[in-house]
Amino acid sequence: MQASIESTGNLERRLTFTLPQERLETHVGGRLRELARTTRIKGFRPGKVPTKVIEQRFGQQVRAEAMEGLLRETFDSAVREHSLRLAGNPRIDQGETDFDFVATFEVVPDFGDIDVTKLSVVRATAEVTDADIDQMIENLRLQRRTWNPVERGAQVGDLVALETWSQAGDERLPAEGVETGSSVLGSGVMFDQIEKGLEGLTKGEEKTLTVDFPAEWRVPQLAGKTVQVHVKAVEVSEPVLPAVDKEFIKSFGVKSGDAEQFRADIRTNLERELKGALMNRLRREVGEQLIAAYAHVEMPPRLVENEARSMLAQQVEQVRRSGRDPGQVPADAHQGFMDAAAKRVLVGLLVGEVARRNELRLESKRVSETLRLIASTYEEPEQVIEMYRNDPQLMNGLQSRVMEEQVIDWIAERAQHTEQSLSFQDAIRV
């Protein structure tokens, strides 16, 4: 195989290579003969379709597929021959002839000695208590609460139905009429100054509040201004929580309505949530230590930029889902994510290097356990497991996640570590 490599930057390489034309023609010919034996075409007996007819009908597709497969195979072979470790996907361009190609890509930087025993890691621990289960049951009661209108003044926990309008200088919002809505006091849904101003209001009572909106407030006409907000309490209602009886318990999928089974199910769910939260804490802790120890290592620029653009895309999607216009996000906004992206790339490459150097292998048992854990959150867990097993993309994502967790655990076990005991609530507050 003809292949040459050159450095075009600290971490960028250019590989020029030529596809073996004979192998391509052999593969194409073999595939066409196979199609001639198996393809049914009107006017010809099975297995008797002339190769020329097959080539006219399928030749272009077969050649394109063969070229793509051979291109990847030849590139991978050249990469192995030159002992290159790629960081990200290559860009492959056509060369001077149909069989010449030029691949441009970035390589993993040299991290030198990776001694994880020098890292200092704080490993959080926590457990689910009966008090945590009691709190979750109370939260479930709040989810199923009903509302009873009252004549007294509004207090924290009450639902207040509102009519509002604002005066910002000479501008009235809305220009005519009022805006209607409702809010549970203490929920933090409304701006804090407005929410506190509603406390004590009775049904039908009106009030004018002076509110200082921050510069980044979501309504441009109010952002950074001191505004007169006129509010009217249309109705004040207090919450009525359901009793924890059999019907209540059955509504959460416990068919027997048994209180002990209900608590056992809640414990299982909370322990699953806690396990994920503790791993996220450990992932962040190990990541921060790796960043501090290897921040001096240059990262592949294109890989970092791609990560920054991916982070921006996630933010744009969040903006869209919130009902705001994603078009307001500047085209170069990814620049603001470059530092965070560089850290993500650094940790990702280091985790990969630790796995490679220490010959860590994906544990199939851990993959199965994680899959069962994910599936257990759905009503039909077996269907979820089957869906993952039949979807290579989903399964690859799961395996990558499990492999990362294995490496994080491996690093934490060998680093200098101290344990930090947390309550359940503190532990899940990541």
UniProtKB/Swiss-Prot annotation:
Cross-referenced SUPFAM superfamilies: FKBP-like, Triger factor/SurA peptide-binding domain-like, Trigger factor ribosome-binding domain
EC number: 5.2.1.8
Record carries keyword Isomerase: yes
GO cellular component: cytoplasm
GO biological process: 'de novo' cotranslational protein folding; cell division; chaperone-mediated protein folding; protein transport; protein unfolding
Leader sequence segment: none
Key words of the record: Cell cycle, Cell division, Chaperone, Cytoplasm, Isomerase, Rotamase
Compartments, as annotated in UniProt: Cytoplasm
UniProt catalytic activity: [protein]-peptidylproline (omega=180) = [protein]-peptidylproline (omega=0)
Domain PPIase FKBP-type as annotated: residue spans: 157-242
InterPro entries the UniProt entry points to: PPIase_dom_sf, Trig_fac, Trigger_fac_C, Trigger_fac_C_sf, Trigger_fac_ribosome-bd_bac, Trigger_fac_ribosome-bd_sf, Trigger_fact/SurA_dom_sf
Function: Involved in protein export. Acts as a chaperone by maintaining the newly synthesized protein in an open conformation. Functions as a peptidyl-prolyl cis-trans isomerase.
Protein name (record): Trigger factor
Species name: Xanthomonas euvesicatoria pv. vesicatoria (strain 85-10) (Xanthomonas campestris pv. vesicatoria)
Gene coding for it: tig
